[in-house]
Regions:
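Mature catalytic core of soluble alpha/beta enzymes
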Residues: 2-329, 336
Length: 336
């Protein structure tokens, strides 16, 4: 799992601040879970005569993203792209590729979707061999890393033979978006989709979703934010790492150097209009030097360890979201 867990999801009535899940009427909502994308996914919708069928269709949309983008499924679309030939990207994979290219440019190349070989080399790919690579191994993998080496033409793409795409930093958020699109298609205006901590939610009127963000050093919440409509994602070095001697090796790799990211950051959380933006931005901001990331125009919370103590920095509208002053999309200024 790429993500730090986002916990304590509750539906609140703003005026009374009543925790809906603690006091909900029996049978008013349906909540189902699945194991998908190597994590637990959850969908919460109002109970109707068609809710069972609708929720299954939404889970199927998540399956579709996994079949397209998972490097852990040998026959997935993304694994078919490494033969050096031209391929037409499917309507499922194409939006992820386009968002990844955008984040590559915004990050100055630190966020690079072509870093699949590096990610595997450091032990976080399908091979699962967790060891620090040699300088020679890193140099070899870097020769097959770099979005500037990829050829594109409209919806077609050609990678150098042996290059590996990795869109894991976008896939869960995008899967939540696809599931949410199914729910909206069926006329639902109140719902929550949780794809392993990548949350997309919607609610009309004064009812809001209350979402707690996990403290990197405990099981408590370090922040609780409120949303009418939008998405939230957290990337963290503490959620997926291994020890190599005295070093902690994180799953987030700097594609420019080929080395696992070394940073004071423990987590970055982002609120955006949709899941793919929140998911990708939380990873991109984690890849940037902390002071550079904090200047980026996003609704974000950075938690880092400085001098043995935790330091929290909130940007954009984060503090307003914490104070229950959730705003409609037109006022929230979400990052696309």
């Amino acid at each position: 799992m790429k993500k730090a867990t986002i916990i304590t999801v509750a539906f609140l009535l703003l005026a009374a601040a009543t925790i809906f899940f603690a006091n909900r009427k029996r049978g008013e909502w349906i909540e189902e879970k699945r194991f998908q994308m190597a994590t637990v996914t959850k969908i919460v919708i109002p109970r109707t005569k068609n809710s069972g069928t609708i929720i299954q269709e939404a889970f199927a949309a998540i399956d579709e993203v996994e079949r397209a983008a998972s490097r852990f499924i040998p026959e997935s679309e993304i694994n078919s792209l490494n033969d050096g030939q031209w391929h037409k990207l499917s309507p499922v994979l194409l939006p992820m590729w386009e968002k990844a290219r955008e984040l590559y440019e915004l990050s100055g190349g630190r966020f690079d979707p072509t870093a699949g070989k590096l990610i595997s080399l450091w032990g976080f790919g399908p091979e699962g061999i967790k060891k620090e690579p040699t300088a020679e191994e890193i140099e070899e993998a870097l020769r097959l890393t770099g979005l500037d080496k990829v050829e594109t033409s409209n919806d077609f793409i050609r990678l150098p033979k042996g290059m590996r795409l990795d869109l894991n930093s976008l896939a869960a958020g995008y899967a939540a978006d696809r599931a949410a699109a199914v729910l909206k298609k069926h006329g639902l205006t109140k719902f929550l989709v949780d794809a392993g901590g990548e949350i997309v939610c919607a609610s009309p009127g004064k009812k809001i979703w209350d979402i707690g963000i996990k403290d990197p050093e405990s099981e408590n919440e370090t922040s609780v934010i409120s949303l009418y409509n939008g998405a939230v994602s957290t990337s963290g070095s503490y959620a997926n790492f291994y020890k190599s001697g005295s070093n902690s090796v994180t799953h987030i790799v700097d594609a420019r150097t080929g080395k696992a990211a070394k940073t004071s950051l423990l987590s970055v959380s982002v609120v955006a209009r949709d899941g793919i933006a929140a998911d990708g931005l939380s990873t991109m901001l984690f890849c940037l030097p902390p002071e550079e990331g904090k200047k980026f125009p996003a609704n974000a919370m950075f938690i880092e360890e400085v001098g043995g103590k935790l330091k929290t920095t909130k940007t954009g509208e984060w503090e307003n979201l914490e104070k229950w002053r959730a705003k409609q999309d037109s006022n929230l200024r979400p990052t696309d």
